[in-house]
């Protein structure tokens, strides 16, 4: 079953399923995040080596939900705090098969590119980052009308980043928050407008 799920994700990302660029994620397994907060905080580490073990779509769904998924469908509240409740952090899921954008409200992944951009995420100084099977790229949106400066996007990215750390710890996985990346290449590959800012990235694996 796990291999089938991974294969389905690969097909979506590479465009092998021509008529469908959106995949509905499995419901997150919140029960898998049952480690106590105290234990998660004690065990949380920044890890910089990863095995070749793939990440299932089910596990990815759980991590994305913990990052900034919808925690209360009635109110639209998400798992991470957000300045002025803008909920502006976009999470791009990057793997060898391409890039997808996470839609928290729909619980879906939308294909953005079929290219492997993990080398640009790693940058020149930290090649270990491109060995992780998946990297999450956190992007904020600048809004000059509501945000007088860029600190609010950085704050929101920090909240999401901590959630990713704690979720990976609870799931027995590895991650590290990084600000180093090839900003110019990534902005081009992700087709980001000038109002978007690359905040952080999280290589994730085992």
Predicted regions and their residues:
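N-terminal amphipathic, basic helical "cap/leader" segment at the start of enzyme domains
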Residues: 20-132
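A glycine-rich helix N-cap at a beta->alpha junction
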Residues: 191-206
